[in-house]
Amino acid sequence: MYVDAHGDFNDTNTSPTGNIHGECLAASAGLGLPDLTNLYFEGQKVDPHNICFVGCRDLDPGEKVLMKKAGVTVFAMSVIDRQGFSEIVKKVLKFFEIHADWIHVSFDMDVLDPMYAPGTGIPLPGGLTNREALLQMGEMASIGNVLSAGIVLVRPSLDV
């Protein structure tokens, strides 16, 4: 599960900036330059059909196309706002019931609205509340098959 304001699903053809940190998830899915896709071992690390993305609100146009083409499941903030967070949590849990025996959660602090957590590298208004994030992580922990998790892009010097 990828919880992030940004897609990190660009490749060299879709990235408007060329920043490598915007290509890491696509590279893990086997898309992009061989120098990235073949780190540690050759080829795909994660089947993109098993990626569930929650909370994005700043996707590049080419990145959106690449995610859709690859089969990534995306619950953008616009979808969360329309359907309600509790409904999306149910859909995420159902997704993992079908798609994964074990789950890694990547939680980027910029998924949170900077009103609640400004201590991140790329703050972007319109994100999850702290309560929504706690609910999501609590529900993920309760299903019992989260094998690992990482909390990334934390900048305490900018936090309150």
Model regions: which residues?
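Active-site histidine-anchored catalytic micro-motif
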Residues: 1-38, 143-147
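Conserved beta-strand scaffold positions in the cores of enzyme catalytic domains, especially
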Residues: 2, 51-53, 74, 148
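Active-site flanking residues adjacent to catalytic metal/cofactor-binding acidic residues
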Residues: 3-5, 54, 105-109
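Short, glycine/acidic-enriched loop or turn micro-motifs at the edges of active sites
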Residues: 7, 58, 109-113
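Solvent-exposed alpha-helices and their adjacent loops that cap or buttress functional pockets
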Residues: 18, 42-46
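A general structural motif
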Residues: 32, 52-60, 129-131
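Aromatic-lined glycan-binding groove of carbohydrate-active enzymes
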Residues: 48-50, 57-62, 99-103
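Catalytic cores of soluble, metal-dependent hydrolases
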Residues: 66-69, 73-160
